[in-house]
Regions:
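Charge-rich amphipathic alpha-helical interaction elements
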Residues: 1-119
Length: 119
């Protein structure tokens, strides 16, 4: 029976592809955690902004300063929501780019492994 002269190299390529897949899974977990943190921050921030608006409305009903503060608070909420949405988009774009790159690297490793002659 002949021994496979490329067995070790084939095993190394398989291990490298597996490590790349593991790194991608870890990155996805980090991404999901980050997106959850963004969502939690956004929820908390909007709750606080709503509570602030209710307080201002209760304490200073119909004053011009009250209207200015409410308008400023609403603008801050909108800016925060836009920033959170931008962060979601940027994070997902980064993940998709890394995913495509990693998938390509994994495919290359698997192709290299498949091209090795058996002998």
């Amino acid at each position: 029976m002949k021994t496979d002269i490329n067995e070790e190299e084939r095993a190394q390529l398989k291990a490298a592809a597996y490590r790349k897949e593991q790194q991608l899974e870890e990155f996805q977990q980090v991404k999901n955690g980050y997106l959850q943190l963004l969502e939690n921050f956004n929820t908390t921030f909007n709750d606080l902004a709503r509570d602030y608006e209710e307080t201002v409305n209760d304490d200073l009903a119909h004053e011009a300063a009250n209207e200015d503060e409410l308008a400023a608070n609403q603008e801050l909420k909108q800016q925060t929501n836009r920033t959170i949405a931008d962060q979601y988009d940027a994070t997902n774009q980064l993940y998709n780019r890394i995913r495509r790159q990693s998938d390509g690297e994994i495919d290359d490793l698997n192709k290299q492994r498949s091209r090795l002659p058996w002998a």
